[in-house]
Amino acid sequence: MAKEQGTKPIAQNKKARHDYAIEDKYEAGLVLTGTEVKSLREGRASLAESFITIDRRGEMWLEGANIPEYLNGTWNNHAPKRKRKLLLHAAQIDKLARQTQAKGFTIIPLSLYFKDGRVKVEIALARGKKEFDKRQSLREEQDKREALRAMRYANKQVR
C-alpha cells in the first residue's frame, strides 16, 4: 500500500481558535495502538473537549480526545477516550512546561493529521480569550467577509 501524501486533517479543534489566542504552534507525534490508527484512517476522531497535560516525569499526554473503536476490530479494540502520549523533544517539553507556569497559558491540540504515514497532532501554546475579545474577533471576521463580498460585487458590476 502506498503512503498517503499531504497533510489533510483528520480532526480539527475548531472551538480552540475561538476560545484561545494562539501564541506558538508545535508538531508532535502520537503513540497509538493498531486499531486507533485504523479508526483514524477512516476519518473518525474528535478533538472537542480535549486538552494536554505534562506530568512530573516530563511527559506530555493528550487527554479527552475521542478516537472511536475500529468497526472491524475484535475483542482487542482500544478504549476510545484513553490518555495518549505525545512525542516531542525534551527541550521542547521543558520550554512548554515553563511557559504554562505563566499565568493564563495552556497547551491545546489544534488538529490531527497524517504526515508520511504517521499520525501527528498540531499543538499550540495559547492564552484564554475574555468574552469581549471573542466578540471583537467575531466582528473583525464579519467585517472581512463583508469587504470581500463588496469587492466581489463591485468586480461583477465592472464586467
UniProtKB/Swiss-Prot annotation:
GO biological process, one term: trans-translation
Record GO terms (molecular function): RNA binding
Keywords: Cytoplasm, RNA-binding
Localisation per UniProt entry: Cytoplasm
A Pfam cross-reference name: SmpB
Family matches, as InterPro entries: SmpB, SsrA-bd_prot, SsrA-bd_prot_CS
Gene Ontology CC entries for this record: cytosol
Keyword Isomerase in annotation: no
Protein's UniProt keywords contain Cytoplasm: yes
Gene3D superfamilies: 2.40.280.10
UniProt-listed PANTHER family: SSRA-BINDING PROTEIN, TMRNA-BINDING COMPONENT OF TRANS-TRANSLATION TAGGING COMPLEX
Function recorded in the entry: Required for rescue of stalled ribosomes mediated by trans-translation. Binds to transfer-messenger RNA (tmRNA), required for stable association of tmRNA with ribosomes. tmRNA and SmpB together mimic tRNA shape, replacing the anticodon stem-loop with SmpB. tmRNA is encoded by the ssrA gene; the 2 termini fold to resemble tRNA(Ala) and it encodes a 'tag peptide', a short internal open reading frame. During trans-translation Ala-aminoacylated tmRNA acts like a tRNA, entering the A-site of stalled ribosomes, displacing the stalled mRNA.
Family assignment from sequence similarity: Belongs to the SmpB family.
Protein's name according to its UniProt entry: SsrA-binding protein
Species of origin: Bifidobacterium adolescentis (strain ATCC 15703 / DSM 20083 / NCTC 11814 / E194a)
